[in-house]
């Protein structure tokens, strides 16, 4: 099979497209003929050798796929060859075949195409559990979303609205803010032209945001500390800016706030029940029409380097997806 292969730690330019052996079947597994694979910021960290779970070289990146089941392990129920599925895996998704645990695979709902399905699990799963299980977002609260037109940011806007929050979206261009508005944001802040703290306080009658969703880090995190309400919660999703901020403990004390770490992938180990329950909820919301997944760019498998460079260059909104032609 063809696969994108990482043989040396580094950036996207280190990747090659080669013939590779198919992954062995695992207990409780599904073999999937991959039609599409989601591209995530974590993939860039993984190929640099900086991800928390460092795979052995060589490997294929890619932690979410969509395609058709071609084989099931003995004893697997609920799936059969030919089923259209999407799945969360550790890595190995940038390939023509992948093996996933059946418990972390889901039937693709009617009306959802393979490209959309490939980009659904990570971004929607992240935002849903971050806002519900970790941050405890309540109806009537104010949610501030940084990077609101990006992959996870856009889903946080949608889910925040579904949960009954007032959503303030930040982004760096008017066009990106317009996309956040299309997905339900109540208020928009152009951080390249406006002071985030000043605008948040204006929009909340001086109170600040109850929950702040931050996949950006750097200057966005600094703005969060200045924009948070008393007793508020900042949830750390990632560091798309490339800068990992330091947390001044004195501000946490004085403002009576919490800074919460979040790692969606670790729910597979520690709370798989929450992860699978969350995905069922999200699929129900999708069926209702409450979620509108956005894939702004697609690339062929052989163009994986270009896809990752587009992600790192912040050229996309919503998701980037690779397609295999299968």
Residue map of PLM features:
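Glycine-rich beta-strand-centered segment in the early N-terminal region that forms part
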Residues: 22-39, 50-92
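NAD(P)H dinucleotide-binding glycine-rich loop of Rossmann-like/cofactor-binding domains
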Residues: 33, 45, 56, 84-147, ...
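Short glycine-centered segments of the SAM/dcSAM-binding site in methyltransferase folds
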Residues: 84, 142, 166, 232-233, ...
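Short, glycine/polar-rich helix-capping loops at beta-to-alpha or helix-loop-helix junctions
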Residues: 93-96, 171-179, 244-249
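Mid-domain Rossmann-like dinucleotide-binding core that forms the NAD(H)/NADP(H) cofactor-binding site
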Residues: 118-194
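Glycine-rich phosphate-binding loop and adjacent beta-alpha segment
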Residues: 171, 219-291, 316, 323-326
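Short amphipathic alpha-helix with an adjacent loop that forms part of the alpha/beta core around
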Residues: 196-206
């Amino acid at each position: 099979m063809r696969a994108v292969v990482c043989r040396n730690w580094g950036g996207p330019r280190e990747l090659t497209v080669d013939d590779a052996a198919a992954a062995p079947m695992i207990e409780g597994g599904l073999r999937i003929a991959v039609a599409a694979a989601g591209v995530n910021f974590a993939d860039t960290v993984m190929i640099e050798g900086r991800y928390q779970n460092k795979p052995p070289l060589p490997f294929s990146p890619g932690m979410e796929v969509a395609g058709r089941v071609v084989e099931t392990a003995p004893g697997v129920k609920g799936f059969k060859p030919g089923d259209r599925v999407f799945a969360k895996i550790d890595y190995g998704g940038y390939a023509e075949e992948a093996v996933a645990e059946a418990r972390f695979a889901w039937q693709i709902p009617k009306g959802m195409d393979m490209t959309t399905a490939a980009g659904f699990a990570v971004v929607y799963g992240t935002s849903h559990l971050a806002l519900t299980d970790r941050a405890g977002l309540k109806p009537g609260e104010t949610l501030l979303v940084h990077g609101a037109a990006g992959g996870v940011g856009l889903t946080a806007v949608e889910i925040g609205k579904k949960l009954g929050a007032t959503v303030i979206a930040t982004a760096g261009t008017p066009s990106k803010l317009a996309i956040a508005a299309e997905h339900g944001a109540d208020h928009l802040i152009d951080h390249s032209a406006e002071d985030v703290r000043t605008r948040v306080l204006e929009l909340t009658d001086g109170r600040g945001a109850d929950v702040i969703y931050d996949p950006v880090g750097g200057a966005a995190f600094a703005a969060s500390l200045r924009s948070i309400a008393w007793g508020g919660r900042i949830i750390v999703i990632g560091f798309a800016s490339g800068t990992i901020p330091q947390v001044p403990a004195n501000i946490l004390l004085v403002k009576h706030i919490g800074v919460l770490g979040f790692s969606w992938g670790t729910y597979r180990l520690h709370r798989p029940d929450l992860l699978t329950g969350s995905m069922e909820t999200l699929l129900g919301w999708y069926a209702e029409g409450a979620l509108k997944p956005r894939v702004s760019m697609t690339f062929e498998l052989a163009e994986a380097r270009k896809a990752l460079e587009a992600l790192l260059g912040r050229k996309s909104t919503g998701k980037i997806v690779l397609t295999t032609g299968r």
